[in-house]
C-alpha cells in the first residue's frame, strides 16, 4: 500500500480539468494500479477508482491513519460549522454531506464508508421516536440515500448542504423529505 504526502484530489480522468471524485488525506492507504505521463491510477481505501498526480505519492507509511481525537462524531462535526460545501470534499477547505459523516467518525477512531448510500447501508434502521443524537438521517427517493445528516434531536440536523441558499455545514430544522434514520453500531 502507498499513501500521499498531502491532501490530494482524486480525479475521474488523468487531466487537470477532470471531475473531482473524492480526496485522499495524508496517511490514507491507496492502491497504485499504474503510472502514466505523470499521473497515477489508484483505488482509495474506500474503493474509489481515480487518478492523482504521481508526484503526490509518498510520505510516511499509512500505519495507523485513523484518528481518535473526539469523544463522538457530532462534537467533531460541530467544529466544521460554516465550512463551505464541496462535492467530494473531506476537509476544512470544503466538505460534502457524506464527507462530513465520514470524517466525523474518523475523528473518533472509527471508519465508516465514504458515500451516503454506503453509510445508509451500514446502519441499522431506527424509528424517529427512538433516534439518538448522532444517528444518521437519510434523504432521497428510489431506495438509496442521496443526502445524509446527523440527527441532533427535536427535529434538528447537522449536515453539509448546498440547498435553498444554504452553503456548507449547518445545524437546521430537518427538511420534510426525511427517508429514514440509521444507527451505526460498532463492535469492539
Regions found by a protein language model. Give the residues of each.
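Aromatic- and glycine-rich peptidoglycan recognition patches
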Residues: 2, 68, 152-188
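Boundary regions of SH3-family modules and the immediately adjacent low-complexity/disordered segments
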Residues: 1, 15, 29, 36-37, ...
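Structural motif
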Residues: 28, 134-135
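Beta-loop motif signature
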Residues: 3-32, 85
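Catalytic nucleophile-His microenvironment captured as a short glycine-rich beta-strand/loop
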Residues: 136, 145-156
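Catalytic cysteine-centered active-site loop
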Residues: 85-133
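Short, basic/aromatic beta-hairpin or loop at an interaction surface
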Residues: 1-11, 103-118, 152-153
Amino acid at each position: 500500500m502507498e499513501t500521499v504526502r498531502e491532501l490530494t484530489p482524486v480525479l475521474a480522468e488523468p487531466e487537470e480539468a477532470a471531475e473531482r471524485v473524492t480526496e485522499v488525506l495524508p496517511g490514507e492507504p491507496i492502491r497504485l494500479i499504474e503510472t502514466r505521463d505523470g499521473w497515477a491510477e489508484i483505488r482509495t481505501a474506500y474503493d474509489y477508482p481515480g487518478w492523482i498526480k504521481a508526484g503526490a505519492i509518498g510520505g510516511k507509511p499509512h500505519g495507523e491513519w485513523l484518528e481518535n481525537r473526539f469523544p463522538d462524531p457530532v462534537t467533531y462535526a460541530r467544529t466544521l460549522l460554516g465550512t463551505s460545501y464541496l462535492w467530494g470534499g473531506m476537509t476544512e477547505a470544503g466538505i460534502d454531506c457524506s464527507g462530513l459523516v465520514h470524517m466525523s467518525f474518523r475523528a473518533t477512531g472509527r471508519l465508516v464508508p465514504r458515500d451516503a448510500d454506503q453509510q445508509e447501508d451500514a446502519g441499522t434502521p431506527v424509528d424517529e421516536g427512538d433516534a439518538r443524537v448522532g444517528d444518521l438521517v437519510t434523504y432521497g427517493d428510489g431506495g438509496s440515500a442521496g443526502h445524509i445528516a446527523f440527527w441532533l434531536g427535536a427535529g434538528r440536523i447537522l449536515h453539509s448542504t448546498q440547498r435553498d441558499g444554504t452553503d456548507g455545514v449547518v445545524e437546521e430544522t430537518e427538511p420534510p423529505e426525511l427517508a429514514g434514520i440509521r444507527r451505526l453500531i460498532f463492535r469492539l
